[in-house]
C-alpha cells in the first residue's frame, strides 16, 4: 500500500515496534486486518491495536489489561467458541494464551509453554499470529538462549482448545549461523508473522536487526517433524 505509519500519540512518540498483522474473519464472514504492536514512550512500553480494511487508512487504539502487559500480543485469525483469542507473554518469559469478549481488553492469561530446550532456556515468545491448519493452530515461536541468541521454533495447538499443546519442535526451525551473527543486534533471527500458501509456509524474518531473510518450508513437513506432547 506504500503507507508508512508514524507515531501520532504520546505512548508511541519514541517507537512503534514489532507489528503482528493478521487477516481476521469476523462472525459475519467479512474480513478486517488487525495489527498489534508495541508502543514506546522512552520510559514505558504498551500494546496498541491497528485496524484497517484497505491498508490505506488505519485506526489505532490502546490495548489494556493484565494479559496485555509486556510485548508480543498476537491475535488469532478468528474467534474460538465466540471469544477473541491471543498469544501473550505477560511475564516476559513464557508463552501464554488469553481470551476476551473485548478485543481491546485482556484480563487474564494462562501459560501454555515454558522453556525446555537449551536454545530457549532464557525466554520464549511468539513470532506472530497462529496459522489455522487441519492439524491444529500452527504457532511460530522464538526462544532466547545463551549469549542472548534468538532462534525460531514452532508449536501446534488444538483447534478447539488452543490451551492444549499437541506437538512442538525440539530443535529450532531457524538458528543464527555465521551469516546471521554480525549486525546491529548480533545472534538474532526474529519474525513477527508468516503465512501459508497452499502447503508452503512463507516466513520472513529479521536478521541481527539489520537485514531481512525469507525462508519457506512445507506446512505438512513442518508439522510431521514435531514431537508429540504427552
Language-model regions, residue ranges each:
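Beta-rich carbohydrate-recognition and catalytic domains
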Residues: 1-14, 22-74, 78-122, 132-184, ...
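Signature of short aromatic-glycine-proline-rich micro-motifs recurring in repeat-based ectodomains
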Residues: 18-20, 127, 183-194
